[in-house]
C-alpha cells in the first residue's frame, strides 16, 4: 500500500470569527514497510494530519491518494481484492471503500484505553473485525491470536477491560486494531502515561510489526523513542511540514529542535557536548550504542598513550 498526500490544507470553521487553519499545503508520501515518527510542538497539526490518512477528516484543499488492494464492490457476495486507488478529498458524495480504508489504515489515538467499552476483552478486540463483516468465529480467533501478540495472557479474554491497568488497556486497544489486519498502523502518543518498562514493551511490539512488513507511524513528543526506533521523521510546526528526512539527520540538529520548541534526544545533547570538547562519536541511537562508542573511544585513547 502507498499513500500520497497532495498539497492538503485543513481549515476549521471557515469564514467565521474563529476560523483556524490546522494544515497548510502539506505534501508527503508513505511507502509500505516504513517506520516513521511524526513530531512537533503541541498544536502543530500532527493529530489533525493523521486523521486525514484514513478519512476521519477530509482536507479543505488538496487530496490524498491511497493505492493498494481493495475489495471489488461489484460482487458483494464473493468480493475479490484488486489493485486500485482511492482519492480522499472534499466532497458531498459518499466515499467509496471507506470500510476498506479504515481496515487497512488503523489509528490508535492517545489514551486509546478510554475507547474500550465491551463487557469482555474478547468482545472488545473482536468488535472491529465484526463491524467490517468478519464472522464472529473468525473475529474471536483473531482476539485469541492478537492478545498474545500484545503481551497479555489468553485467559484475560473473558475479563472486563475495566479491571486492567492503563498500560494493559492500551495493549487491548492495540490488539483491537491489529485484529483488523491493517497494512498501516498509526499511533498518537502511544507511550504517554506509561512507565519506562511499559513504553519499552509497546515499542518492541511496534518494532516486531514493522519487521513483519507493516508500516508503523508514531506521533510522539518523546524524541528519544523516535531516535531509537524510527527510520524517518516528519517535523510539523504551525500546520507546515518543516523537515522530512532520516530520523538521525533530523534529530541531530539540536539547535533547530530547540528553536522549534522541541526537547532534543538526551543522547544527542550529550553527544554534542562531547563533540564540543573534541570527543567525536559515530551515530548513536540508543544507550547501548552510546556505551559502545564511549568504550571504543577510551580503548583508542589508551592505545595511543601506550604507543607514545
UniProtKB/Swiss-Prot annotation:
GO terms for molecular function: ATP binding; ATP hydrolysis activity; ATPase-coupled transmembrane transporter activity. SMART domains: AAA. It is an enzyme of class 7 (translocase). Its main location: membrane. Keywords: ATP-binding, Cell membrane, Membrane, Nucleotide-binding, Translocase, Transport. Coiled coil: none annotated. The keyword rRNA processing does not apply. It holds the Pfam family ABC_tran. InterPro entries: AAA+_ATPase, ABC_transporter-like_ATP-bd, ABC_transporter-like_CS, ABC_transpr_CbiO/EcfA_su, ECF_ABC_transporter_ATP-bd, EcfA2, P-loop_NTPase. It comes from the Bacteria. One of its GO terms (cellular component) is ATP-binding cassette (ABC) transporter complex. ATP binds at residues 40-47. It is a peripheral membrane protein. Its EC number is 7.-.-.-. The keyword Transport applies. Residues 3-263 form the ABC transporter domain. It is found in: Cell membrane. Belongs to the ABC transporter superfamily. Energy-coupling factor EcfA family. ATP-binding (A) component of a common energy-coupling factor (ECF) ABC-transporter complex. Unlike classic ABC transporters this ECF transporter provides the energy necessary to transport a number of different substrates. Forms a stable energy-coupling factor (ECF) transporter complex composed of 2 membrane-embedded substrate-binding proteins (S component), 2 ATP-binding proteins (A component) and 2 transmembrane proteins (T component). This is Energy-coupling factor transporter ATP-binding protein EcfA2. The lineage of its organism: Bacteria, Bacillati, Mycoplasmatota, Mycoplasmoidales, Metamycoplasmataceae.
Amino acid at each position: 500500500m502507498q499513500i500520497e498526500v497532495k498539497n492538503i490544507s485543513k481549515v476549521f470553521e471557515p469564514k467565521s470569527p474563529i476560523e483556524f487553519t490546522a494544515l497548510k499545503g502539506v505534501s508527503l508520501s508513505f511507502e509500505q514497510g516504513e517506520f516513521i515518527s511524526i513530531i512537533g510542538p503541541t498544536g502543530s497539526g500532527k493529530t489533525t494530519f493523521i486523521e486525514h490518512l484514513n478519512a476521519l477528516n477530509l482536507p479543505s484543499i488538496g487530496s490524498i491518494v491511497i493505492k493498494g488492494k481493495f475489495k471489488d464492490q461489484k460482487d458483494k457476495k464473493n468480493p475479490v481484492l484488486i489493485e486500485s486507488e482511492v482519492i480522499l478529498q472534499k466532497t458531498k458524495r459518499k466515499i467509496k471503500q471507506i470500510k476498506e480504508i479504515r481496515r487497512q489504515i488503523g489509528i490508535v489515538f492517545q489514551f486509546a484505553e478510554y475507547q474500550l467499552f465491551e463487557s469482555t476483552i474478547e468482545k472488545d478486540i473482536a468488535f472491529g473485525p465484526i463491524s467490517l463483516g468478519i464472522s464472529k468465529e473468525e473475529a474471536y480467533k483473531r482476539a485469541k491470536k492478537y492478545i498474545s501478540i500484545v503481551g497479555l495472557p489468553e485467559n484475560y479474554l473473558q475479563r472486563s477491560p475495566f479491571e486492567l491497568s492503563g498500560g494493559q488497556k492500551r495493549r487491548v486497544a492495540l490488539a483491537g486494531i491489529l485484529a483488523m489486519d491493517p497494512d498501516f498502523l498509526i499511533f498518537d502518543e502511544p507511550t504517554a502515561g506509561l512507565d519506562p518498562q511499559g513504553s519499552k514493551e509497546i515499542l518492541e511490539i511496534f518494532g516486531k510489526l514493522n519487521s513483519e512488513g507493516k508500516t508503523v507511524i508514531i506521533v510522539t513528543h518523546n524524541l528519544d523513542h523516535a531516535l531509537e526506533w524510527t527510520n524517518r521523521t516528519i517535523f510539523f510546526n504551525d500546520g507546515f511540514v518543516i523537515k522530512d528526512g532520516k530520523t538521525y539527520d533530523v534529530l541531530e540538529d539540536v539547535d533547530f529542535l530547540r528553536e522549534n520548541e522541541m526537547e532534543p534526544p538526551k543522547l544527542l545533547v550529550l553527544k554534542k557536548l562531547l563533540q564540543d570538547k573534541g570527543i567525536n562519536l559515530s551515530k548513536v541511537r540508543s544507550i547501548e550504542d552510546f556505551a559502545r562508542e564511549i568504550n571504543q573511544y577510551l580503548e583508542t585513547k589508551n592505545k595511543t598513550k601506550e604507543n607514545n
